[in-house]
């Protein structure tokens, strides 16, 4: 139920390591604000969707995808709790999100990554994403994949 999602996400992000928060939000946040949580809960299910992954009844990963109005491009941001990394959860979640985006006719799926987030970049490469510099910012890369023509 959506009324349960706010507290669930708040508890999840309280268990996410500081480096993983930095990689997810591309900033030096130490915690996730109520406004950020609200944006993850109050999705429109048309241009934005938040996918949740559970293990043994606990939330262990979340993946937010947001598309432009034309559904030409969508951006995805995923975070997996540290104690559940290296189990294929991020890989599976990204694959599921890519299939969802493809089913909506979205042509390109992208993610902006911190250049040091090599684990995420490697997962994205494994799933056929290409990596390019992000504008003039040497600390970031854009990872993208064409889903349909």
Q: What is each of the regions a protein language model found here?
A:
Residues 20-28:
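A short, aromatic/hydrophobic, helix- or strand-capping loop or linear motif
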Residues 27-75, 81, 148:
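Acetyl-CoA-dependent GNAT
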Residues 80, 86-103, 118, 122-126:
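Conserved acetyl-CoA-binding loop-helix of GNAT-fold acetyltransferases
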Residues 125-134:
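Conserved acetyl-CoA-binding loop of GNAT-fold acetyltransferases
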Residues 134-149:
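C-terminal "cap" of GNAT-fold acetyltransferases
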């Amino acid at each position: 139920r959506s009324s349960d999602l706010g507290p669930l996400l708040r508890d999840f992000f309280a268990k996410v390591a500081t480096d993983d928060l930095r990689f997810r939000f591309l900033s030096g946040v130490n915690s996730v604000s109520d406004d950020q949580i609200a944006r993850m809960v109050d999705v429109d299910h048309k241009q934005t969707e938040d996918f949740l992954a559970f293990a043994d009844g606990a939330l262990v990963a979340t993946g937010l995808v947001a598309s432009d109005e034309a559904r030409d491009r969508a951006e995805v941001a995923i975070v997996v709790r540290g104690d559940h990394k290296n189990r294929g959860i991020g890989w599976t979640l990204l694959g599921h999100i890519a299939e969802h985006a493809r089913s909506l006719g979205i042509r390109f799926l992208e993610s902006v990554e911190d250049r040091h987030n090599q684990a995420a970049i490697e997962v994205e490469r494994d799933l056929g994403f290409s990596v390019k510099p992000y504008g003039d910012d040497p600390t970031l890369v854009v990872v993208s994949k064409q889903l349909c023509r």
